């Protein structure tokens, strides 16, 4: 089920750092749109503060980061910035060329999943759907605890 609540899941698909190769992120954005999600797609070369600001303004459920070169190495800093902004509930996935040795550091930072080249459409959609639903449930739980 793509809808969690009353509106489609909202996914921010972006590239941080200096990598400008966007073919993979465009394909994934189309997969998610075709599955009924609302996709906010940014141009390349985004900054961490810019992604955090956009995630807040757009009230996203999941963030997908595309990395062709080494831009995934700054994702742990982005995860810290998301938590500092109160967005720790937002699911984060990374797609692209990420060496296996570096995937554990991303997981330790809070990245839910790393998709390599050739990841199946169904696998991506199922993962993002589950993360989006979890994000919304955690947001509701956080709100309920803060407003008894």
Swiss-Prot record:
Keywords tagged on the record: Cobalamin, Cobalt, Isomerase, Metal-binding, Plasmid
Binding locations of adenosylcob(III)alamin: 21
Any one GO BP annotation for this protein: acyl-CoA metabolic process
Catalytic activity: 3-methylbutanoyl-CoA = 2,2-dimethylpropanoyl-CoA
Enzyme Commission code(s) on record: 5.4.99.-
Domain B12-binding: 8-138
Uses: This enzyme and the derivative PCM-F, a variant in which the alpha and beta subunits are fused into a single polypeptide via a short 11-amino acid linker, have potential applications in bioremediation of pivalic acid found in sludge, in stereospecific synthesis of C5 carboxylic acids and alcohols, and in the production of potential commodity and specialty chemicals.
Source organism superkingdom: Bacteria
Cofactor: adenosylcob(III)alamin
GO molecular function, one term: pivalyl-CoA mutase activity
Enzyme class: isomerase
Function: Together with Xaut_5043, catalyzes the reversible isomerization between pivalyl-CoA and isovaleryl-CoA, using radical chemistry. Does not exhibit isobutyryl-CoA mutase (ICM) activity.
Subunit architecture: Monomer in the absence of the PCM large subunit. Weakly interacts with the PCM large subunit; an alpha(2)beta(2) stoichiometry seems to represent the active state of the enzyme.
Family: Belongs to the acyl-CoA mutase small subunit family.
Protein name: Pivalyl-CoA mutase small subunit
Native source species: Xanthobacter autotrophicus (strain ATCC BAA-1158 / Py2)
């Amino acid at each position: 089920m793509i809808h969690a609540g009353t509106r489609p899941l909202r996914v921010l698909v972006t590239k941080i750092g200096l990598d400008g190769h966007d073919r993979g992120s465009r394909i994934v954005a189309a997969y998610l749109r075709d599955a009924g999600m609302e996709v906010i797609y940014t141009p390349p070369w985004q900054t961490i503060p810019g992604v955090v600001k956009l995630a807040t303004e757009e009230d996203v459920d999941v963030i997908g980061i595309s990395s062709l070169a080494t831009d995934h190495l700054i994702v742990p800093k982005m995860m810290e910035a998301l938590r500092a902004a109160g967005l720790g509930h937002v699911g984060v996935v990374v797609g692209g060329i990420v060496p296996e040795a570096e995937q554990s550091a991303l997981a330790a930072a809070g990245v839910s999943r790393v998709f390599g080249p050739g990841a199946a459409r169904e696998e991506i959609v199922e993962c993002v759907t589950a993360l989006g639903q979890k994000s919304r449930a955690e947001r509701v739980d956080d709100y309920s605890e803060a407003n008894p």
